[in-house]
Amino acid sequence: YLVVFRGTDETIVGWKEDFNMSHQTQVPAQDAAREYLTKVMTEFDGQYIIAGHSKGANLAIYAASQLDKKLQDQVSAIYAYDGPGYQRDFLETEGYLAIESKIHAFQPEDAVVSQILFHTVQAKVVACKGISMMQHLLENWEIDKVSFKERDSVTPGSQRLQATLGQWVDQHSAQELEAFFGAIFGIIEATGIETLNEIGDNFLMFLISLQREIRDTEDSDLLKEGFAQLQAIYKEQGDETNANFLEVVQGKIDSATSFIKNLVPDALLPGKSEDKQVEEGGDPQAKSEETDHGTI
């Protein structure tokens, strides 16, 4: 059997949960993945391959680590494609260590997502088209007949990003990380934006609203201090060339916006599916359910 977990959708809520992984021992999607995988493997006896892309890769590994020994023995392999990592404590748990040797990890040469938090399995580096977050799209991964075209290592920029984020996370407690990311997403949510697509479609208005919320928030000093620390660490990781961390972040945001626009069909954007159904004579009340659960 093959169980595959999907990644994050375009909602701000979904991305907020991704960053919550930096300070929460378990996020709701991980718990749902654990429950789903346990249920499926209990119902259908046999050997399993578990896989996932992006956040789905994180869920695949996490869910497998939470299985009891009998079910873990039925997992033949786990394939993780450009997924964010874990807190260091998780990587030392008995459940994770039991399935560590079964993990096959892959990341693009200019990786961003898989450079967040920590891993113990060395990922194979895949040659890709595009740069930055556009390489997160699997359609941009290069294939040679039946296998990925590989590179020796990720780009220097990707290495620097990983070193910066890793050192910054190590320097802060769970409470400090929760406060920082809570402030960031609190500001974004205060602008009324609910999806990354809305940011891309109304970027100028979003920036104006964001500046206003940052100016008015009680967490302004907290955010300034956090970004100043990131900037200082980033400079320590290399020379002064392209040493502005905020400019790098802006580039990642621009790339992420393009990434989301390529990832999500118009029919799945808020309001678009109903318009299309009405045009085609369909039922505008019909809704589809999307979850982080896998499929078998």
Q: What do these predicted regions represent?
A:
Residues 1, 5-47, 68-296:
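Alpha/beta hydrolase fold serine-hydrolase catalytic domain that processes acyl esters and thioesters
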Residues 60-69:
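Short glycine-enriched nucleophile-adjacent loop
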Residues 52-56, 60:
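Gly/Ala-rich beta-loop-alpha elbow adjacent to hydrolase catalytic centers
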